[in-house]
């Protein structure tokens, strides 16, 4: 399944690793990415092949577990 993901979060090594881990748990193969930084935050927009796709509930749990995540779209 091809899925578009967007995450805005504090720009820390730990949060980037946690997001990468989430994508990898779904067998993520990045097709396209767009990255930008602003005011201590990073915005990551990905188009990726994921199996299974990341669900709304998983996105909510990821945000709850990682307070530095400000926005996430799946």
Each model region followed by its residue ranges:
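Canonical alpha-helical transmembrane segment with a positive-inside/aromatic-interface signature
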Residues: 1-35
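Short amphipathic alpha-helices in soluble, non-transmembrane regions
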Residues: 18-24, 55-68
């Amino acid at each position: 399944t091809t899925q578009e993901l967007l995450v805005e979060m504090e720009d820390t090594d730990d949060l980037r690793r946690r997001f990468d881990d989430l994508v990898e748990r779904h067998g993520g193969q990045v097709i396209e990415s767009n990255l930008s930084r602003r005011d201590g935050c990073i915005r990551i927009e990905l188009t990726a092949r994921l199996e299974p796709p990341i669900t709304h509930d998983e996105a909510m749990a990821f945000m709850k577990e990682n307070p530095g995540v400000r926005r996430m779209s799946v």
